[in-house]
Structure formats: structure tokens, C-alpha cells
């Protein structure tokens, strides 16, 4: 009877240990120190016009200026080529470009490449980039 209880106790300890290890392995670490999010939207009409915007936020008391750089890119000749670039800078901790429209050609893949820069005054604290793939435009 004592051996049975000891085996049960050991089994419970092993299960609890596995649960603790699993829980600690599932902790999500932040990708950036200051930047919280990068957002964008890209839609292409049947007539071949890309409508897009990009933005992001860095909600930290250390951040007082944010700059967003949005590149519309086309996959051509086995590489991403930038068709146009838009930039917006804002005081505070968030920035967003206005909605832009740009003509694109059928038969290529497109994406937005968005970079967000967080500043304290003129000192760059952090820069992060995020691609958003639209896919192939027939």
C-alpha cells in the first residue's frame, strides 16, 4: 500500500513538473522593445490599382516621435523591386500614412514592406520592419 502511494505521489510530481515546463515554454516574448505594432493594408482592384496604407505604434514614455516608411514592391526578375515609397512622421507614439493609390501591372506578385522607427527627439531608439505579401495579381 505504501509503495502504491509513493508511486502515485511520484506520478503527480512528474505531471506537475511537466505542466510547469510546458507553461514556461509557452511564454511569449516581445519582438521589440518600444514598438508594439506595425499595421498595413493592400488591396488591388481588377483594373490594376493598388490601394494601400501603413502605420504603427510605439507606446512608450521614451518615444515622442514615430516615422513610418511604406514601400510598395513588385516581385520581378527573382527579386523584390520597390515601385514607390511613402513616409509619414508624427509627434507622439503612432504614425500612419494616408491612403495611397498606385497603378500596378497584371502578372506579378506584390507586397508592402513597412518600416516603423521610434525616436526620442532625434535619437533613433528602435527600427522594425514587416513585409505583408499580397500575392500574385493575375
What are these regions (language model features)?
Residues 24-138:
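Low-complexity, Ser/Thr/Pro-rich intrinsically disordered linker/stalk segments at domain junctions
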Residues 2-25:
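Sec-dependent N-terminal signal peptides of Gram-positive bacterial secreted proteins and lipoproteins
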Amino acid at each position: 500500500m505504501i509503495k502504491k502511494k509513493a508511486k502515485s505521489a511520484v506520478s503527480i510530481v512528474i505531471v506537475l513538473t511537466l505542466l510547469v515546463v510546458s507553461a514556461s515554454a509557452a511564454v511569449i516574448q516581445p519582438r521589440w522593445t518600444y514598438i508594439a505594432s506595425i499595421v498595413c493594408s493592400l488591396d488591388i482592384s481588377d483594373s490594376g490599382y493598388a490601394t494601400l496604407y501603413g502605420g504603427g505604434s510605439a507606446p512608450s514614455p521614451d518615444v515622442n516621435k514615430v516615422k513610418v516608411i511604406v514601400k510598395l514592391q513588385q516581385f520581378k526578375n527573382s527579386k523584390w523591386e520597390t515601385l514607390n515609397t511613402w513616409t509619414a512622421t508624427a509627434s507622439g507614439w503612432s504614425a500612419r500614412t494616408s491612403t495611397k493609390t498606385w497603378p500596378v501591372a497584371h502578372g506579378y506578385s506584390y507586397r508592402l514592406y513597412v518600416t516603423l522607427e521610434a525616436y526620442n527627439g532625434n535619437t533613433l531608439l528602435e527600427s522594425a520592419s514587416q513585409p505583408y505579401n499580397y500575392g500574385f495579381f493575375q
